[in-house]
């Protein structure tokens, strides 16, 4: 094992220990074994860069259909949208969820198409720096199903877009209102998620969520678009293949280029509460981080050493 790999391993161990005992006193997070909301899908939020920001058409006044693959099934959902990194309010005129027929095309099963409401309204405005969670919605789906979340955006202009830049899944954008269309011809196909934070489902007592937090390794670097080949995806498949673990959902919180003390997006030490501790239903956590803290040549590592 060369020195760089050894340092990465040691740093990962230190990171795990430090996160487990951050602050002046150790924190013990108690989780209750009872029915409640559990995260069946999620992504780690960050700012969309120029290459990940849609143009011609942009999101303003247009339709965006995004796909997700859930880890456990359910019959009730809550959808959380994020404008955490935005600097202006984002207006969304409508949100719908449906079963996706094929990960490579925007066609949905129209018989499953369901409106997602916020405080009883179809329209929602997400203030800058905030997240919103939908009403409880009746919607039935099975573990490992592919779902489509379709949004029709309003007249917000400019501003920073909150996204997960490396979705490794197709997102389809078309001009105008295609919110309830069974399918449409996209004018732009991106591979980022926009304003889409998490999907929760109601689970019975004994349900658990495991969070996978890390950098590009966790985020599926170099994996095939629409193949859902992150290690967290494979973990979800294996958990569902065993009757004893079908009650465990998987929440992926990797960010390519992320680091313990910096890197791309919010540093792992600063997002741990948001992306692990506060994830609905969390019981377990896999931490794989540290290589980017020592991998960038010529950078000052004084903070890392400290």
Regions found by a protein language model. Give the residues of each.
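C-terminal motif of bacterial Sec signal peptides marking the signal peptidase cleavage site
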Residues: 17-21
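Bacterial N-terminal signal peptides that target proteins for export
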Residues: 1-10
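Low-complexity, intrinsically disordered short peptide segments enriched in small/polar/basic residues
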Residues: 10-11, 26, 283
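Conserved SGNH/GDSL esterase-like catalytic core that processes O-acyl groups on lipids
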Residues: 63-66, 89, 97-104, 175-192, ...
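N-terminal secretory targeting modules
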Residues: 24-213, 223-225, 244
């Amino acid at each position: 094992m060369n020195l760089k790999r050894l340092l990465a391993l040691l740093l990962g161990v230190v990171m795990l220990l430090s996160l487990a005992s951050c602050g002046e006193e150790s924190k013990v997070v108690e989780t209750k074994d009872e029915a409640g909301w559990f995260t069946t899908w999620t992504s780690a939020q960050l700012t969309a860069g120029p290459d990940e920001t849609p143009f011609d058409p942009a999101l303003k006044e247009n339709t965006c259909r995004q796909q997700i693959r859930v880890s456990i099934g359910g019959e009730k959902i809550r959808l959380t949208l994020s404008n955490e990194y935005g600097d202006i309010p984002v207006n969304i005129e409508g949100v719908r969820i449906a079963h996706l027929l094929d990960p490579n095309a925007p066609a949905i099963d129209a018989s499953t198409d369901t409106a997602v409401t916020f405080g009883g309204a179809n329209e929602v405005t997400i203030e800058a720096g905030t997240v919103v969670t939908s009403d409880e919605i009746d919607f039935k789906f099975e573990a490992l199903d592919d779902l489509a979340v379709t949004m029709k955006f309003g007249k917000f202009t400019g501003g920073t877009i909150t996204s997960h830049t490396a979705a490794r899944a197709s997102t389809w954008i078309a001009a105008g209102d295609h919110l309830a269309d069974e399918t449409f011809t996209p004018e732009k196909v991106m591979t980022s998620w926009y304003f889409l934070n998490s999907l929760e489902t109601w689970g019975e007592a004994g349900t658990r969520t495991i969070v996978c937090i890390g950098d590009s390794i966790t985020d599926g670097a170099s994996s095939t678009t629409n193949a859902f080949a992150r290690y967290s995806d494979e973990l979800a498949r294996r958990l569902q293949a065993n009757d004893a673990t079908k009650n465990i959902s998987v929440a992926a919180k990797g960010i390519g280029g992320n680091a313990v003390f910096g890197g791309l997006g919010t540093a792992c030490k600063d997002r741990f509460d948001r992306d692990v501790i506060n994830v609905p239903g969390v019981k377990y956590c896999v931490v794989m981080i540290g290589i980017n803290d020592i991998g960038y040549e010529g950078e000052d590592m004084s903070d890392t050493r400290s």
